[in-house]
């Protein structure tokens, strides 16, 4: 790839910032625009010296190659200006689809577990061979002359159909975007279409009934804990230090593996990584070494200690993700009370999953909900957080300006979950806890 100047419209988006970092590492000039409000991704961009500008059509210059975030429509002033200047314009997924062509590429798709699995795979392969990667938590690394390129493949609006990877891990299929997909059949159709673009093999979770139906031109290997899975985890042991298991491929032992991660899903994610490494004939002992020193990805069970409290920040916003996060908290802290603070994400999703939210949030020892986080597409709805708390014993709605109800808990774990701006609630709690 010859050196170029890439201009990102929406550079602070999690995928966009990761891609900007990859191109910067590969020796290109990179800059971009976004809102001025602080976003967690800009820390990495600033550290790399990548210029972030406020939106302004005057930013665009002749010779730039433009990469536009998928949330910006063609009538955005900067996109219009880029067209006037005759600049080459790519959408994020289109550009990524081109970029991965020069590598042994491994995508990770699925409604849940994408970022955690991509992060684990990127970390593990990086310790064994030259690996470039793009993770949905805003982390990206471009290594010149890489063998592997690991990337997160998002099914939203069928964007992942821009990718033709060598391998694809599919963690699960779920009806997670009711604003775009019409139902499970529609989501399955997208995954099957993508499966038929994979060049070497698919690694799919064996307990997902939809993934079990996959028909593809390449082999589909299933991973899980049952005897019918191709890659099987046996002798699983989960304790307060992490999770360990023996990995088998068709009854042949690959090796023993440990990850310092928590929750049932962590074993599955690690097994998927082992499966890809096994197909690429990588040394199982080296893979075990790298899995054992993984430290996690941003906003996935990110922990801190303050006073006598453990505070966890997690991106979980779908019922299955909340269940997995609370399960992880119970595994790591079996003797502490688990307090859930959840910010529902969008009215349509909250309404679609109301009974499931009630069920999974009831697993916590105490539950608080913030008001619903609305998206740019959807400002109001027919449901309120109070509709959910009313169905959970002892649950209540909590507001950023009054986090005092959390001060009654001591020597406990508070798990903040959400995909919106839940961090501002966490920050407000930390402020009053520190002052107490």
Curated annotation (Swiss-Prot):
GO cellular component, one term: cytoplasm
EC top class, as a word: ligase
GO biological process, one term: regulation of cell shape
Pfam families: Mur_ligase (PF01225), Mur_ligase_C (PF02875), Mur_ligase_M (PF08245)
Name listed for the protein in its UniProt record: UDP-N-acetylmuramate--L-alanine ligase
Binding site for ATP: 110-116
Involved pathway(s): Cell wall biogenesis; peptidoglycan biosynthesis
Reaction(s) catalysed by this chain's protein: UDP-N-acetyl-alpha-D-muramate + L-alanine + ATP = UDP-N-acetyl-alpha-D-muramoyl-L-alanine + ADP + phosphate + H(+)
Primary localization class, coarse: cytoplasm
Gene: murC
Organism: Lacticaseibacillus paracasei (strain ATCC 334 / BCRC 17002 / CCUG 31169 / CIP 107868 / KCTC 3260 / NRRL B-441)
Domain of life the protein comes from: Bacteria
Function: Cell wall formation.
Family note: Belongs to the MurCDEF family.
Keywords: ATP-binding, Cell cycle, Cell division, Cell shape, Cell wall biogenesis/degradation, Cytoplasm, Ligase, Nucleotide-binding, Peptidoglycan synthesis
EC number(s) reported in the record: 6.3.2.8
GO molecular function: ATP binding; UDP-N-acetylmuramate-L-alanine ligase activity
Subcellular localization(s) per the UniProt record: Cytoplasm
